[in-house]
Amino acid sequence: MFGKGGMGNLMKQAQQMQERMQKMQEQLAQMEVVGEAGAGMVKVTMAGSHSVRRIEIDPSLMEDDKEMLEDLVAAAVNDAVRRVEEQNKSKMGELTGGMQLPPGFKMPF
């Protein structure tokens, strides 16, 4: 079915892919993206692991409506999450060489 050395070769390739995925996960965790809201008045810096590293709020917003500020922070966090997901998808696409994965199959993140 696998031919001469086919199964061993397949296992070796799987192990190499696993090692590359581990390295990619480490690189993605170190990556940072910045999500913005309110034309850059609220910025959220997020790691590739989805942890928020920093929130910057323009001082002029401190005088405004608290509810609006909360909405802008939430929007900036959501923008950062979207950017992390795009970056992760792009990097994993590079790793898998554009290999089409079955629907619902998620990489280990």
From Swiss-Prot:
Annotated spans, Disordered: 1-23, 88-109
Question: Where does this protein reside within or beyond the cell?
Answer: Cytoplasm, Nucleoid
Named from the GO MF annotations, one term is: DNA binding
- Could you give one GO CC term from the UniProt record? bacterial nucleoid
> Out of the domains of life, which is the source?
Bacteria
**Residue spans of biased composition, Low complexity class:** 11-23
InterPro entries the record matches: YbaB-like_sf, YbaB/EbfC
Q: Does the keyword Aminoacyl-tRNA synthetase apply?
A: no
Q: Which Pfam families match?
A: YbaB_DNA_bd (PF02575)
Give UniProt keywords alphabetically.
Cytoplasm, DNA-binding
Subunit: Homodimer.
> What role is this protein assigned?
Binds to DNA and alters its conformation. May be involved in regulation of gene expression, nucleoid organization and DNA protection.
Q: Family, per the entry?
A: Belongs to the YbaB/EbfC family.
- Supply the name of the protein: Nucleoid-associated protein AHA_2212
